Design a protein with these regions (language model features):
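Nucleotide/phosphate-binding catalytic cleft detector across ATP-hydrolyzing
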Residues: 1-4, 26-131, 149-288
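Gly/Thr-rich phosphate-binding beta-strand-loop-beta motif of the actin/hexokinase/Hsp70
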Residues: 1-24, 128-147, 166
Length: 288
């Protein structure tokens, strides 16, 4: 069994994979929660028991993290409870070991682990396509791939971050829970914030896709991440929504680093559910 960690700015997602890469179970921990390697192990162990998983069967740990100040907890967890040195998803690990991502020569080195695993996953899905990846997280990121070369990208605030920015920097605007607006004509403060942020995001994403298409007219646009499924319904330029792209990419990173002889593995066949929406094909790889 392989244990992956997808550490984002909002949530930490532990992922239990079998040797073929099928996801056995996942759960979420708030990133801001204070914990040590001991409390983390207790959470993992209790969850594994609830899913009838034997935690002693974990043979490797892969960590994709965009929160460096908590990485040490996961290093200590691996060493103390599993006698494993966790492998972190980094650009050096990709470039030096598996050669799956080439960086455009003039680009500064700063590609985060979350974007690396997204790229590895889409390159596995569509090795021959020009690809634009849109990941709807705390920030919404755009990454352009052509001929296995990372060409660049951009970052805009995500929906939750936009709501928090309004609340934190104004005296009278409330902090609200985001809900999909029924109309752009908000009738109170909360509905107006929802409408403005939602349709503002839709509009900015459409415009950014348009700008990328000027340089890469054949780009195939893939969306992923929390709010991505709903927003994708409003953006006809998005070709496909893949809900677990990061989790797929973490195992692909493991496979390329540790299982090179197993060129494909069973796992990538996944469990596929196809839905028709906006005349495009949507994929749910793992039915958990």
């Amino acid at each position: 069994m392989i244990l992956g960690f997808d550490i984002g700015n909002t949530h930490i997602v532990p992922i239990f994979y079998n040797e073929d890469g099928n996801i056995l179970a996942t759960f979420r921990i708030p990133t801001h929660l204070e914990f040590t390697e001991d409390t983390l192990f207790i959470m993992l162990n209790e969850f594994a028991k609830s899913k009838n998983l034997e935690i002693s069967n974990i043979k490797n740990i892969i960590v994709s993290s965009v929160v460096p100040n908590i990485n040490e907890n996961f290093i200590r967890l691996g060493k103390k409870y599993f006698e494993i040195d966790p492998t972190f998803v980094t650009l050096d690990n990709v470039e030096n070991k598996i050669k799956e991502i080439k960086i455009f020569p003039n680009m500064e080195r700063g590609l985060g682990a979350d974007r690396i695993v997204d790229i590895l996953a889409v390159k596995k899905l569509y090795p021959e396509k020009e690809l634009l990846i849109i990941d709807f997280g705390t920030a919404t990121t755009f990454d352009m791939i052509k001929d296995s070369t990372y060409m660049g990208g951009c970052i805009i605030p995500g929906i939750a971050l936009s709501i928090n920015a309004l609340f934190s920097n104004t005296a009278a605007l409330p902090k609200i829970e985001f809900t999909e607006p029924e109309t752009v004509l908000g009738i109170n403060t909360a509905s107006q914030i929802n409408a403005g942020i939602f349709y503002g995001n839709v509009g900015s994403i459409k415009e950014l896709i348009l700008q990328y298409k000027k340089f890469f007219p054949n780009a195939y646009v893939i969306a992923t991440g929390g709010q991505g499924e709903k927003i994708s319904e409003y953006i006809e330029q998005i070709n496909e929504y893949v809900p677990k792209l990061g989790e797929m990419g973490i195992f692909e990173f493991y496979r390329l680093n540790f299982l090179k002889e197993n060129s494909d593995g069973i796992w990538w066949k996944g469990i596929t559910v196809k839905n028709e929406r906006n005349n495009e094909r949507y994929i749910n790889w793992f039915n958990i």
